[in-house]
Amino acid sequence: GDDVKSACCDTCLCTKSNPPICRCVDIRETCHSACNSCVCTASIPPQCRFCYK
């Protein structure tokens, strides 16, 4: 389905770098199986939000 756009990790953390980098803190320390990469939002504080195949 279209879950890939929202699928991410159990816990996502954004670094304080500029631009912020999304770090996946998962049981397996990887992103969701449907997801190759996550990005941080431009909000403050940044949040891991989007996932891409």
Swiss-Prot record:
InterPro entries, sorted: Bowman-Birk_prot_inh (IPR035995), Prot_inh_BBI (IPR000877)
Cellular compartments per GO CC: extracellular region
UniProt site positions, description: Reactive bond for trypsin: 16-17
Source species of the chain: Lathyrus sativus
Keywords attached to this entry: Disulfide bond, Protease inhibitor, Serine protease inhibitor
Intrachain S-S bonds: 9-24, 12-51, 14-22, 31-38, 40-48
Family note: Belongs to the Bowman-Birk serine protease inhibitor family.
Protein known as: Bowman-Birk type proteinase inhibitor 1
Job of this protein: Inhibits trypsin (IC(50)=6.20 nM), neutrophil elastase (ELANE) and, to a lesser extent, alpha-chymotrypsin (IC(50)=3.44 uM).
SUPFAM superfamilies: Bowman-Birk inhibitor, BBI (SSF57247)
GO molecular function per UniProt: serine-type endopeptidase inhibitor activity
Subunit structure as annotated in this protein's UniProt entry: Dimer.
Annotated signal peptide: none
Domain of life the protein comes from: Eukaryota
An individual GO BP term: negative regulation of endopeptidase activity
Transmembrane segments: none
PROSITE patterns: BOWMAN_BIRK
